[in-house]
């Protein structure tokens, strides 16, 4: 199934493109000495504290520190790249509260296959963009469609 596109106003389209450009320019923020010690390799950013710290003092050749200027435009912050607002769904009833023109759904990871198939079916009937239908769900829906066509 083709991906639905949200009809975005021109300023929002421009801001989504700008967000993509800013994302490409943003450096990877690393904790001090993460390249030196395996135990802190994947621990993420921690603010620097010492008076002699090169990152805090923004020395040339050292990793960039986290700063306000790397933030994305407020209007598109938290939006999916397609322009939809991403919403986590765990059952079919939650779809009734959402608008297919502005929301895209992501099915919760604890939802089993049977309920996931029901959610995807109902969401597509209502016109929602499902971000993570899953390969097994797609296969089950195709099989169901084929049996319905051959049965007629």
Swiss-Prot record:
GO biological process annotation, one example: translation
UniProt-listed InterPro entries: Ribosomal_eL32, Ribosomal_eL32_arc, Ribosomal_eL32_sf
Entries under CDD domains matching the protein: Ribosomal_L32_L32e
Cystine bridges: none
One Gene Ontology cellular component annotation held by this UniProt entry: cytosolic large ribosomal subunit
GO function term, MF aspect, one: structural constituent of ribosome
SUPFAM superfamilies: Ribosomal protein L32e
Keywords, in A-Z order: Ribonucleoprotein, Ribosomal protein
Superkingdom per UniProt: Archaea
Family: Belongs to the eukaryotic ribosomal protein eL32 family.
Protein name stated in the entry: Large ribosomal subunit protein eL32
Organism of origin: Pyrobaculum aerophilum (strain ATCC 51768 / DSM 7523 / JCM 9630 / CIP 104966 / NBRC 100827 / IM2)
Lineage, broadest ranks: Archaea, Thermoproteota, Thermoprotei, Thermoproteales, Thermoproteaceae
């Amino acid at each position: 199934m083709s991906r639905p596109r949200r009809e975005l106003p021109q300023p929002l389209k421009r801001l989504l493109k700008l967000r993509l450009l800013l994302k490409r320019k943003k450096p990877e923020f690393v904790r001090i000495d993460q390249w030196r010690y395996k135990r802190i390799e994947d621990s993420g950013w921690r603010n620097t504290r010492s008076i002699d710290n090169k990152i805090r003092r923004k020395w040339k050749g050292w990793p960039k520190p986290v700063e306000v200027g790397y933030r994305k435009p407020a209007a598109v912050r938290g939006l999916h790249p397609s322009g939809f607002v991403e919403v986590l769904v765990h059952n079919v009833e939650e779809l009734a509260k959402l608008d297919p023109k502005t929301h895209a759904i992501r099915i919760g990871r604890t939802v089993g296959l049977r309920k996931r198939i029901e959610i995807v079916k109902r969401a597509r009937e209502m016109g929602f963009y499902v971000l993570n239908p899953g390969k097994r769900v797609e296969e089950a829906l195709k099989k169901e469609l084929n049996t319905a066509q051959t049965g007629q």
